[in-house]
Amino acid sequence: MAFKQLFAAISLALSLSAANAAAVIEKRATCSNGKTVGDASSCAWFDVLDDIQQNLFHGGQCGAEAHESIRLVFHDSIAISPAMEAQGKFGGGGADGSIMIFDDIETAFHPNIGLDEIVKLQKPFVQKHGCTPGDFIAFAGAVALSNCPGAPQMNFFTGRAPATQAAPDGLVPEPFHTVDQIINRVNDAGEFDELELVWMLSAHSVAAVNDVDPTVQGLPFDSTPGIFDSQFFVETQLRGTAFPGSGGNQGEVESPLPGEIRIQSDHTIARDSRTACEWQSFVNNQSKLVDDFQFIFLALTQLGQDPNAMTDCSDVIPQSKPIPGNLPFSFFPAGKTIKDVEQACAETPFPTLTTLPGPETSVQRIPPPPGA
C-alpha cells in the first residue's frame, strides 16, 4: 500500500487526538459567515465555495462540470514520476496545478483530451479569488464530490505552490493500457498498490466520457452517474452486449446497457486476479466505498507535496446528501440478473442483489460542459 500517504494521513489524524483537543479548540476561528474553522486562513475559501457552487456547478449539481472537475484532480495529481527523477529527468510535480498553468501543453496530451474545457471554466475563479491553481483544482474536486449524494466528507488541504514547468507526457493512464501498465504507473506515482488503484476508480461512479467515442458525448460509466454509489462496480461485472455509439473505438469494449460506456481498462481491472476481489468488495458495501475513496482522494491531492506543510481547510467542504432512500445501495438494473454477471473473484461469491422492476434500463446521456 501507499505507506507514505498512509503515514501522512495517520500523522494528521493524530494531531487532532484527544490529547491535543484543548489546543485545537483554542486555534479555531470564526469566519464572517459565522462558520468556525480550524485555521483562520480557511475562511477565504467560503467565498470561493459560494461562487463555484452557483456559477460553476449550477447550484450544487452533480453534473458534467462536477464530473470533469473530479477527473481534473486525477489527471493533475497522477502526473508525477519518482522513477524519472531517479534517472535525472523532470518527473512532474503531482498535484501542483500544472495542467492549468501549462494547459496549452498538457491538455494536448492524449489522455487529457477534453479537459481543456473544464480548465477554461475554472481559470476565471482562480484569477478572481487569487488562489493557486493546484489548490483550486483540489478544492473544486472536493466540492464537486460533495454535490453527489452518497459521497464521503472530502478532505481539503491548502499550500500548493504554483507549478514552474509542465508535467511530461505519458504519465496519465489510458483506457487501452494493460492492467500491468496501470498498476506500475500508480505505484511509481505514489507507491499505490493494486487495491488502491481500485479505490481510485471509484470516481467512475460519478463520471461520463466525452472523447472515447467521437459520435456521442456524455456517456456515463454506470446507470446512476449523479450518485456516488457502488453501481459502477456492479455494472462493470455484467456481460457486455453492445456499444452505445459507433463501437470499435480504441480503449472501448461492449457495455451491458444502452447508453452506458465501458472502457477497456475498467473491464480488465474488474476481471484481473489481482484486483477482482477488491472490485467486487465494493458491491453493496457503501461504508467501505466511502472510507477507501476518502483516503485515496486525499493521498492523490497531496502527491508531490509535503503534507506537514499544508493547512487543513476541510471544514469548508460541505457534506454530501445521502443516497435517495428509494434505491438500495447496489442492485441489478432492470432486465439484468445474476446470470449476467461475469464472476471474476475466486474467493467469494457475488453478493445477492435485487433486480429493479420495469423495462430494460437505458442510461441517459449527460450533456457535456459548454463548448465541449
From Swiss-Prot:
UniProt-annotated binding residues for heme b: H204
Coiled coil stretches, renumbered: none
Record text on cofactor binding: Binds 1 heme b (iron(II)-protoporphyrin IX) group per subunit. Binds 2 calcium ions per subunit.
Pfam families per the UniProt record, alphabetical: peroxidase, Peroxidase_ext
Transition state stabilizer (site feature) positions: R71
Record-linked InterPro entries: Ccp1-like, Haem_peroxidase, Haem_peroxidase_sf, Ligninase, Ligninase_C, Peroxidases_AS, Peroxidases_heam-ligand_BS
Catalytic activity: 1-(3,4-dimethoxyphenyl)-2-(2-methoxyphenoxy)propane-1,3-diol + H2O2 = 3,4-dimethoxybenzaldehyde + guaiacol + glycolaldehyde + H2O; 2 (3,4-dimethoxyphenyl)methanol + H2O2 = 2 (3,4-dimethoxyphenyl)methanol radical + 2 H2O
Residues that bind Ca(2+) 2: S205, D222, T224, I227, D229
E.C. number(s) listed in UniProt: 1.11.1.14
GO biological process, alphabetically ordered: cellular response to oxidative stress; hydrogen peroxide catabolic process; lignin catabolic process; response to reactive oxygen species
Keyword Acyltransferase annotated: no
Biased composition, class Low complexity, residue ranges: 350-361
Protein's job: Depolymerization of lignin. Catalyzes the C(alpha)-C(beta) cleavage of the propyl side chains of lignin.
Record family assignment: Belongs to the peroxidase family. Ligninase subfamily.
Identification of the protein by name: Ligninase LG3
Organism from which the protein derives: Phanerodontia chrysosporium
